[in-house]
């Protein structure tokens, strides 16, 4: 849904990337910093410190924005950087959900439903683009930002003691992630049909 605004977002983030370059900070620095913020978020959620965890989500997203902006501003994008960014994003998302499971706010069943959906929606896209010869498989009901918005809402609800709405938000994260997985799988099939795997 929000991917349609990606071009505008990338253009507006360039000045921040230039500022990062002046500080001699690399895209991979921001990628790893994003993962570190997610790790702190997991510990915060594990201790039921929801507002601190929410702050870490904001920091994580700012760092994620800066890694791409820095790469574009300095023409520093690499294949390895892209893979590293993709992997740390998934680790980060899993850590945040894991933190909510650690403190018991989210049941293991619901947490794994959400986490597995997040991972599989991303995995099918990666395989479609690497093995299916598809230039872009950014299709489906929800991308990363939509899922993070729902996660943020869940954290806010937990923070004010509204557990049921929070649980619903986590369930929606899982539901839209699994729907996106199916949509991407069907899209991939329609593109490659019976093309032999390589």
Which residues does each predicted region cover?
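Conserved G/P- and acidic residue-centered "switch" motifs that form tight phosphate/ATP-binding loops
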Residues: 64, 85, 180
């Amino acid at each position: 849904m929000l991917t349609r605004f990606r071009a505008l977002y990338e253009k507006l983030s360039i000045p921040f990337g230039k500022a990062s370059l002046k500080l001699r900070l690399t895209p991979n620095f921001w990628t790893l910093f994003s993962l570190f913020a997610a790790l702190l978020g997991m510990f915060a959620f594990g201790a039921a410190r929801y507002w601190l965890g929410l702050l870490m989500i904001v920091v994580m997203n700012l760092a994620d924005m800066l890694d791409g902006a820095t790469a574009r501003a300095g023409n520093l994008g690499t294949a390895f950087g892209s893979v590293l960014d993709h992997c740390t994003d998934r680790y980060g998302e899993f850590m945040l959900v894991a933190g909510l499971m650690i403190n018991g706010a989210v049941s293991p069943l619901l947490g794994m439903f959400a986490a597995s959906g997040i991972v599989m929606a991303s995995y099918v896209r990666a395989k479609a683009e690497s093995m299916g010869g598809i230039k872009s498989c950014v299709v489906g009901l929800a991308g990363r930002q939509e899922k993070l918005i729902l996660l943020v809402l869940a954290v806010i609800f937990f923070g004010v003691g509204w557990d049921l709405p929070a649980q619903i938000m986590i369930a929606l994260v899982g539901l839209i992630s699994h729907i996106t997985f199916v949509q991407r799988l069907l899209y991939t099939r329609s593109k490659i049909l019976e093309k032999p795997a390589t």
